[in-house]
Each structure stands twice: as C-alpha cells, then as structure tokens.
Curated annotation (Swiss-Prot):
Homodimer. SUPFAM superfamilies: alpha/beta knot (SSF75217). The gene is trmD. Keywords: Cytoplasm, Methyltransferase, S-adenosyl-L-methionine, Transferase, tRNA processing. The lineage of its organism: Bacteria, Pseudomonadati, Pseudomonadota, Alphaproteobacteria, Sphingomonadales. Its main location: cytoplasm. S-adenosyl-L-methionine binds at residues 116, 136-141. This is tRNA (guanine-N(1)-)-methyltransferase. Transmembrane segments: none annotated. It comes from Zymomonas mobilis subsp. mobilis (strain ATCC 31821 / ZM4 / CP4). GO terms for molecular function: tRNA (guanine(37)-N1)-methyltransferase activity. InterPro entries: Alpha/beta_knot_MTases (IPR029028), tRNA_m1G_MeTrfase_C_sf (IPR023148), tRNA_m1G_MeTrfase_TrmD (IPR002649), tRNA_m1G_MTases_N (IPR029026), tRNA_MeTrfase_TRMD/TRM10 (IPR016009). GO terms for cellular component: cytosol. Belongs to the RNA methyltransferase TrmD family.
Length: 249
C-alpha cells in the first residue's frame, strides 16, 4: 500500500491547520489517511525564554525578519523525519505556483512547507538549505499559512481517491493551458437567460468544439499572458510533429 501524501508545516501558528482542509474533500481524505498532516511550531526551536523568532532587518527598515538559525533548526528537525520530501517556502518573492507544479507535487510523497511571516526570512536560509521559494500570486498576505493551505488544497484534490471521478480535474482551468469553459446547470431559463442551445443538443462533438472556443475566448480576454503562452505551444506542435516524422523516415 502506498504511503499517504505527507505535509509537514513549519509555522508560528500551528492552530491554523488543518483549518478549511479539515472539511469537504480534503477533510474526508485526511480522515481516510489518503494524506497526512503535521505541524512544526517554529517557536519551539527558539532558545530564549520569550521564544523569539525574529529580529530587526539589517540595514534598517520597517518590520522584523525571521531568523535563519531558528528556522534552520525547525527545518532540520522536519527533514530528519521526512528526508525524501521537497522543501517549499511560501513567500511573495518566490517562483509563481502553476498547475503543472501542483500536479508534480501531488504525484510525489508530499512536501515540507515553511510559512513566512513579518518582512520575510533571512536570505541565508535559502543559501544554506535546499528550499524552493513559492508564491501564489502578486499580492501580500499576513503570513504564509493561507498560502500553504492554498497550495495543499490544490495538491490534495489531485491525489487519486480524493475526487470522485478520475477525470474530474482534467478539464479545469490551467490543465490544458487555458481557462476552463463556462459552466451551466438547471433551471434552463433564469432571469431571461437560457442555457446555450448547444449544451442541450446532445451532440458531443459540437459541445466539445463550443467548450474549446469558449475556453479560448475567455483566456484571450482575461489572461492574455496564458493566451500568448498557449498560442506559442500550439504553434510549436506541428513543427515538433514534422521533425519527428522526418526522423522516423
């Protein structure tokens, strides 16, 4: 039997977990041992009576910075228990989180996740430990806990056995490089608007074509960055196929 997906969370606020992940699909999966969760209280690794984990920023500036020595002790503790897990740090200075990276993580054994606070973490931690900095968007949160919950939710729902239908996640936004097509359900008529006729036609080919067209339209209008990337990938595919055909001849 495969080991459950393991999440080890380094945080100043262990009581924030599992939070919303204790409910719905993720909550049932946690109860059924499809994934496991542990929290590591960073303050437990401070060595003064006040459990201080931060200090003023070198060079001046507002706020406080999380200390590398204390974070490293907490991280080393978690890595000893989970030597095979990748280490991620939630920070607005990180690499953008993508659906492809989420899928990679969901197919692995789990992750150790460091939740940043204050003005951030001492940069020397990243220089001395193998840590992947991750950002969930171009905005600032009060701390990395909400970002960690978001990352975990995105991963957990892709673990086999969590979502009811095997193909449930395959047509969602970002899985194909596009935003997902619009969704409708009963009633057929609502406030003068009808469900598009094509979706009620029963013609699966027409429905598929309509959904593709709508996904492309919405991506082009709402996410021009994704649209340009999608067009680039689509344009390169015929070239790749032609090269493969020539090599096989």
């Amino acid at each position: 039997m495969n080991k459950p997906f393991s999440a080890s969370i380094l945080t100043l606020y262990p009581e924030m977990f599992p939070g919303p992940l204790g409910h719905s699909l993720a909550g049932r999966a946690l109860e059924n041992n499809i994934w496991s969760l542990e929290t590591v209280a960073i303050r437990d690794f401070a060595n003064d009576r006040h459990h201080t984990v931060d200090d003023t920023p070198s060079g001046g500036g507002a706020g406080m910075v999380m200390r590398a020595d204390i974070l490293a002790r907490a991280l080393d503790h978690s890595c000893e228990k989970h030597p095979d897990l990748p280490v991620l740090a939630m920070t607005p200075r990180g690499y953008p989180l993508t659906q492809s990276r989420v899928r990679q993580l969901s197919e692995g054994a789990g992750a150790i996740i460091i939740c940043g606070r204050f003005e951030g973490m001492d940069e020397r931690l990243f220089e001395k430990r193998a840590i992947e900095p991750v950002s969930i968007g171009d905005y600032i949160l009060s701390g990395g806990e909400m970002a960690a919950l978001t990352l975990l939710d995105a991963c957990i729902r892709l673990i086999p056995g969590v979502m009811g239908k095997i193909t449930s996640g395959e047509d969602e936004s970002f899985e194909t490089g596009l935003l997902e097509y619009p969704q409708y359900t009963r009633p057929v008529e609502w406030e003068g608007l009808s469900i598009p006729e094509v979706l009620r036609s029963g013609n699966h080919a027409h429905i598929k074509a309509w959904r593709q067209a709508m996904a492309e339209r919405d991506t082009r209008l709402r996410r021009p960055d994704l649209w340009e990337r999608y067009r680039s990938v689509q344009a390169s595919r015929p070239l790749a196929r032609n090269k493969k055909d020539r090599n096989e001849k």
